[in-house]
Amino acid sequence: MAKKVTGYIKLQIPAAKATPAPPVGPALGQHGVNIVQFTKEFNARTANQEGMIIPVVITVYADRSFSFITKTPPAAVLLKKACNLKSGSAAPNKTKVATIKKSEVQKIAELKMPDLNAANVETAISMISGTARSMGITVVED
């Protein structure tokens, strides 16, 4: 018989930098999860993605054990990294902060494909392009 699920915890944590300090510790502590064990496992699993923010969904079971799934980094983080930006535009409709080639957007879309609700790569490209526009990044043809 499967374990009884008591809750889900969704967090965005920098890769290989999970610590028992807030926000990770309190979120896990209130569900009775072994915080040190989670941080060690998360840091080991995300060691190759240094510098990225990794969304994680933690499933907590009745016996206080847990399992977790790491997702791909948010599209905004990938776009900022591709354009070497600290943050997007405060007024994206007025101030453009960068340009990105459609081929780079396609690479990001292919990377994000498992986590996107998109039927094909073209749809994923349009979703990532929309995120770029809302950040003040102009998408240009190759």
Swiss-Prot record:
Post-translational modification: One or more lysine residues are methylated.
Keyword rRNA-binding in annotation: yes
Pfam families tied to this protein: Ribosomal_L11 (PF00298), Ribosomal_L11_N (PF03946)
Function, as annotated: Forms part of the ribosomal stalk which helps the ribosome interact with GTP-bound translation factors.
Transmembrane segments annotated in the record for this chain: none
Assembly with partners or alone: Part of the ribosomal stalk of the 50S ribosomal subunit. Interacts with L10 and the large rRNA to form the base of the stalk. L10 forms an elongated spine to which L12 dimers bind in a sequential fashion forming a multimeric L10(L12)X complex.
Source taxon at top rank: Bacteria
GO process annotations (BP): translation
Record NCBIfam families: L11_bact
Family: Belongs to the universal ribosomal protein uL11 family.
Cellular compartments per GO CC: cytosolic large ribosomal subunit
PANTHER family in alphabetical order: 60S RIBOSOMAL PROTEIN L12, LARGE RIBOSOMAL SUBUNIT PROTEIN UL11M
Keyword terms: Methylation, Ribonucleoprotein, Ribosomal protein, RNA-binding, rRNA-binding
Name of protein: Large ribosomal subunit protein uL11
GO molecular function, one term: large ribosomal subunit rRNA binding
